[in-house]
């Protein structure tokens, strides 16, 4: 059985999320999975509706989120990441479908974010493992 993935990718910090997208696609292919649909959203905070749309589809086995939340002048990164992570988990449970977190942050610098682009690979691997095991 070929595993079909949906990607939800934040456009904010696109220099980072583009690298992450490429790594995620490459790793999906390596694992024998297919990226069936990709939805770009403005930022991590905007992901839940796109995730929900993909979770509703019968032809998508799991959803992979890709984003990067970088520390700013305020605690905004903390708020964004906490709410996004919670909603991602809620949607996974609501639809009984793996939704994995490929979003490093919060509290990291741009340099640290560059060092963590491999989170996309981790999220793809987690999605594939969960589909196979559940």
Swiss-Prot record:
Entry function: Catalyzes the formation of 6,7-dimethyl-8-ribityllumazine by condensation of 5-amino-6-(D-ribitylamino)uracil with 3,4-dihydroxy-2-butanone 4-phosphate. This is the penultimate step in the biosynthesis of riboflavin.
NCBIfam families assigned to the protein according to its UniProt record, in alphabetical order: lumazine-synth
Name the record gives this protein: 6,7-dimethyl-8-ribityllumazine synthase
Active site (record annotation): 76
Chain positions recorded as (2S)-2-hydroxy-3-oxobutyl phosphate binding sites: 73-74, 116
Xref: HAMAP family: Lumazine_synth (MF_00178)
Source species of the chain: Methanosarcina acetivorans (strain ATCC 35395 / DSM 2834 / JCM 12185 / C2A)
Catalytic activity: (2S)-2-hydroxy-3-oxobutyl phosphate + 5-amino-6-(D-ribitylamino)uracil = 6,7-dimethyl-8-(1-D-ribityl)lumazine + phosphate + 2 H2O + H(+)
């Amino acid at each position: 059985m070929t595993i079909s993935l949906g990607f939800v990718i934040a456009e904010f910090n696109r220099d980072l999320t583009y690298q992450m997208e490429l790594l995620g696609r490459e790793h999906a292919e390596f694992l024998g999975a297919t990226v069936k649909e990709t939805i770009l959203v403005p930022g991590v905070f905007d992901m839940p509706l796109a995730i929900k749309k993909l979770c509703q589809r019968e032809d998508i086995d799991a959803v992979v989120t890709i984003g990067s939340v970088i520390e700013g002048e305020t605690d905004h990164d903390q708020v964004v990441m906490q709410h996004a992570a919670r909603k991602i988990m809620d949607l996974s449970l609501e639809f009984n479908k793996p939704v994995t977190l490929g979003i490093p942050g919060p509290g990291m610098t741009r340099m640290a974010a560059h060092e963590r682009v491999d989170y996309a690979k981790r999220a793809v691997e987690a999605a594939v493992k969960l589909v196979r095991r559940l």
